[in-house]
Amino acid sequence: MEMKTDAKIRVRLESFNHELLNSSCQKIVNILQNTLSNSIGVITLPTRKRIYCVLRSPHVDKDSREHFEIRTHKRILEIYYNSEVPIFDLLSEADLPPGVFYRICLS
């Protein structure tokens, strides 16, 4: 039996912790593969690295500085599915951990 893929959903996941992000992606993929036979692709996007330079001294000694960085890891899940299936109910069932931000785009 051939399944028609009428619609596509992109779920964009972002997190500062790459282990949380990978486990969240795997959790969503497992939920969707256990209930549906659709095609799911995980795309890894480049990590954004923000570096902040802070002076250690309050008013003098500009040579003494400290650098801090924040890395934002990103993934995109492309889900092709049949439009008759309630895909949003399955995605809301995923219960992602705090610290993982997600956006859902329909196309």
Swiss-Prot record:
| Family annotation (InterPro entries) | Ribosomal_uS10 (IPR001848), Ribosomal_uS10_dom (IPR027486), Ribosomal_uS10_dom_sf (IPR036838)
Cellular-component GO terms for this entry:
chloroplast; ribonucleoprotein complex; ribosome
Compartment(s) where it occurs, according to its Swiss-Prot or TrEMBL record: Plastid, Chloroplast
Q: Which residues form a coiled coil?
A: none
Q: How does it assemble?
A: Part of the 30S ribosomal subunit.
The entry sums up its family as follows: Belongs to the universal ribosomal protein uS10 family.
Q: What is this protein called?
A: Small ribosomal subunit protein uS10c
Q: Which organism is it from?
A: Phaeodactylum tricornutum (strain CCAP 1055/1)
Q: Kindly list the organism's lineage.
A: Eukaryota, Sar, Stramenopiles, Ochrophyta, Bacillariophyta
